[in-house]
Amino acid sequence: MTTTAVDLNILIDIVSADPTHGSSSRAAIERCALEGSLISSPEVVAEFAAGCRSASEAVGILQKLKVEYVEIGQWGAAVAGEVRGRKSSGGRIFADFLIAGHAVAHADRLLTRDLGFARMNVPGLVVVSPDSLLA
């Protein structure tokens, strides 16, 4: 069973029925769900909820998509801090380092369209995109 951390852009694609990425993001998340479990970090959930009408709506959507909320934990936060401390941010916001650290600590891979995560060179972070999964 493979655990997949889901990034914000995938959720937005699905909920907004994005004409360019919506169908591929939905197909990718469905495939990942068939292969194992889906999780999301506190940062992703908070950013997602900010775009919803209410916290209840955000939680309902995540439950419908079978995306489980998992705390980052001490190890995930430490990984994020270590990587951020060693590297220039390269324009990345700190939340991105927390999302990457969360994925390293709790998942086998991170599903995202933001391929900048791969360029972060976070040890142990496996980045997959809808395009790479569905190719």
Where are these regions (language model features)?
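A generic structural signal for short hydrophobic patches within well-formed alpha-helices
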Residues: L11, V45, F117-A118
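Conserved glycosyltransferase catalytic-site signature
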Residues: L8, P42, A95-F97
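Residues at the C-termini of beta-strands that transition into short coil/loop
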Residues: P42, E71-G73, S129-D131
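Short loop->beta-strand "edge-of-pocket" segments that line small-molecule binding or catalytic clefts
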Residues: T4, S37-S40, L65-V70, R109
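Acidic, PIN/NYN-like endoribonuclease modules and their adjacent C-terminal/linker elements
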Residues: T3, A100, V104-A135
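A short acidic, often aromatic-flanked loop/helix-cap motif at beta-alpha or helix-coil junctions
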Residues: A46-E47, W75-V79, S132-A135
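Short, well-structured N-terminal submotif of metal-dependent ribonuclease cores
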Residues: M1-S40, A49-G60, V128, L134-A135
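Active-site neighborhoods of divalent-metal-dependent phosphate/nucleic-acid chemistry enzymes
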Residues: E68-L115
